[in-house]
C-alpha cells in the first residue's frame, strides 16, 4: 500500500519548538486543514458537521532521522529512562505517523481553496502532511478509566505566565489566549532548568522570547 497526503495543516508554529506535546492541551489553539486539489471535494466531508471531534493521522515531517532503536527516552521521564518505542508517542518511530484528536471549530465550504476545516487544540507544525481524517466516536474512542502507563505518574505541570501588556499588543485576542496556554505548558525541553537562560519560539510569525524560574514564566521580548 502506498499513501499520499490528502491535506496539509496550517498552524502558528513554523518550527517544532513550542508545539504542545499532545493534542487538546492548548484547547483554543487554532489551525486549518487544507486539502490538496485531488481531495478538495465537499462531498468527502458530507455529515462531518454532525461530529465535534476528529482524529488526524499525520506525519512527523520535521523528523528525518530513520528510527533504528526499539527504545526511546521520553522527555516526560527526564530523558534518561528508556521505554519501548511502541509504548510511547515518540516521533522517532518506524513510520513516523502521528495521531491527534482535534475539535471542529467550523467548516468553510466557500473558501477559494475550500473546503477548509478549522480546528482547535492541534499539536501540529505548519505544513504537516495529513494522511487521513476520521470522526471521533465517543462510545468507541473514550476510555475514561484506562491506565496511561508512566504518564499517570508524571502529570504535566502548568506555569504561571507573565505577559507584559506592551509586548502583547501585536497579537490578536485569539492568538494571545492560545499563546499563553502554550507557554503555560512549559515549551522547554523537560530536562532544562536554567532560570537565567532566555528561550525563543516562533508563534504566529513572531519571535517569542521568555525565561522560566520555578513555576513562573516571563515573556521578555517579542521580535
Language-model features, listed with the residues they occupy:
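Conserved positions in beta-strands of structured domains
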Residues: 102-108
Amino acid at each position: 500500500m502506498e499513501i499520499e497526503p490528502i491535506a496539509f495543516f496550517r498552524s502558528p508554529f513554523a518550527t517544532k519548538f513550542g508545539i504542545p506535546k499532545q493534542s487538546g492541551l492548548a484547547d483554543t489553539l487554532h489551525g486549518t486543514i487544507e486539502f490538496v486539489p485531488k481531495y478538495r471535494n465537499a462531498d468527502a466531508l458530507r455529515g462531518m458537521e454532525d461530529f465535534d471531534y476528529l482524529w488526524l493521522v499525520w506525519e512527523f515531517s520535521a523528523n528525518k532521522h530513520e528510527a533504528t532503536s526499539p527504545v526511546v527516552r521520553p522527555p516526560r521521564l527526564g530523558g534518561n529512562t528508556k521505554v519501548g518505542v511502541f509504548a510511547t508517542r515518540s516521533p522517532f518511530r518506524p513510520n513516523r505517523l502521528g495521531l491527534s484528536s482535534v475539535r471542529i471549530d467550523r467548516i468553510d465550504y466557500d473558501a477559494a481553496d475550500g473546503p477548509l476545516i478549522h480546528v482547535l487544540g492541534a499539536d501540529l507544525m505548519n505544513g504537516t502532511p495529513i494522511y487521513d481524517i476520521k470522526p471521533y466516536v465517543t462510545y468507541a474512542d473514550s476510555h475514561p478509566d484506562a491506565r496511561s502507563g508512566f504518564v499517570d505518574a508524571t502529570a504535566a505541570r502548568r506555569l504561571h505566565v507573565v505577559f507584559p501588556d506592551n509586548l502583547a499588543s501585536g497579537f490578536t485576542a485569539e492568538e494571545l489566549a492560545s499563546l499563553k496556554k502554550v507557554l503555560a505548558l512549559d515549551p522547554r525541553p523537560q530536562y532544562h532548568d536554567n532560570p537565567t537562560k532566555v528561550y525563543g519560539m516562533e508563534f504566529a510569525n513572531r519571535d517569542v522570547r521568555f525565561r522560566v524560574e520555578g513555576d513562573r514564566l516571563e515573556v521578555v521580548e517579542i521580535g
